Amino acid sequence: MKILLANPRGFCAGVSRAVETVEKVLEVEKSPVYVRHEVVHNKVVVDSLKKKGVVFVKEVDEVPDDAVCIFSAHGVSLKVEEAAAKKNLVLYDATCPLVTKVHRGVRLASNNDAECILIGHKGHPEVQGTMGQYRSKKGAIYLIESEEDLNKLTIKDPDNLYYATQTTLSVDETQGIIQALKDKYPNIKGPKKEDICYATQNRQTAIKAMLKHIDVLVVVGSQNSSNSNRLKELATLAGIDAYLVDNPKDVDKLWFDNKKVCGVSAGASAPEYLVQQIISQISKVCSTEVEVEEFEGIKEEVYFPLPRLLKQKIGTGKVE
């Protein structure tokens, strides 16, 4: 059997920055180091950091006063920021800069008392953080996941209306919802460029290009990873068997029965070493050597610098 490796795949610049932030903070700060929420949605990465001494918490209320705390790549609400400030935490913000960009747009809408429509998945930590940027008492922020949700909305002032999106959505679905928004509310304003991040778009584009060459797809990523699930969905919608896995032990021989070409990709929070472990396991369960070929795609050269406070600590070598 042949394996086609999607390109690009795996870690994006935001995830690389978040993981490196945690690892560097472990070097420059005294233990324990607390992280609010999973720093990225990947079980293998989180478990690895736990072994290094990181303490993951759901809320900053669980973090002792004056302790070291890191915000995850998904971002947090203004309320969480205020709670952290009251506890006098040594705070490192690993929020992805592309999520921060969405936050700025929502805060601007709030400052202008504009109603705001956020396209995203209910309960996702990024969505919770973005919704929590809105403070206007005169306007309101609404969460929608589909065009059906849009039809249920009642907007007070269509001429003072803004939209934003979660960064890890399906590109195709989101474009449809945005167009429906513009059709219903011609004066709606939004970001100059879609908020769906470059990495999410590039990984989805890579899968689409590969679909006609494969008859099964394995996506390396965790079940709670939004962007990994969107990759799997692309294959499923095209009628191709697709599986989401973040542990080599979960690879099943039956997935590859009567299959000639297996596509392999990875969500933006899955490390490359895990991709290689999954490939080795596929070869093992198939009881044969597999031919591995890189499928040509977009080259990514995006880099996000570490948080300012962390760069200062690294530069001076001081632990205050």
From Swiss-Prot:
(2E)-4-hydroxy-3-methylbut-2-enyl diphosphate binds at residues 41, 74, 124, 167, 225-227, 269. Its cofactor is [4Fe-4S] cluster. Keywords: 4Fe-4S, Iron, Iron-sulfur, Isoprene biosynthesis, Metal-binding, Oxidoreductase. [4Fe-4S] cluster binds at residues 12, 96, 197. Pathway: Isoprenoid biosynthesis; dimethylallyl diphosphate biosynthesis; dimethylallyl diphosphate from (2E)-4-hydroxy-3-methylbutenyl diphosphate: step 1/1; Isoprenoid biosynthesis; isopentenyl diphosphate biosynthesis via DXP pathway; isopentenyl diphosphate from 1-deoxy-D-xylulose 5-phosphate: step 6/6. Its EC number is 1.17.7.4. Pfam families: LYTB (PF02401). Binds 1 [4Fe-4S] cluster per subunit. Isopentenyl diphosphate binds at residues 41, 74, 124, 225-227, 269. It comes from the Bacteria. GO terms for molecular function: 4 iron, 4 sulfur cluster binding; 4-hydroxy-3-methylbut-2-enyl diphosphate reductase activity; metal ion binding. Dimethylallyl diphosphate binds at residues 41, 74, 124, 225-227, 269. The active site is at residue 126. One of its GO terms (biological process) is terpenoid biosynthetic process. InterPro entries: LytB/IspH. Catalyzes the conversion of 1-hydroxy-2-methyl-2-(E)-butenyl 4-diphosphate (HMBPP) into a mixture of isopentenyl diphosphate (IPP) and dimethylallyl diphosphate (DMAPP). Acts in the terminal step of the DOXP/MEP pathway for isoprenoid precursor biosynthesis. This is 4-hydroxy-3-methylbut-2-enyl diphosphate reductase.
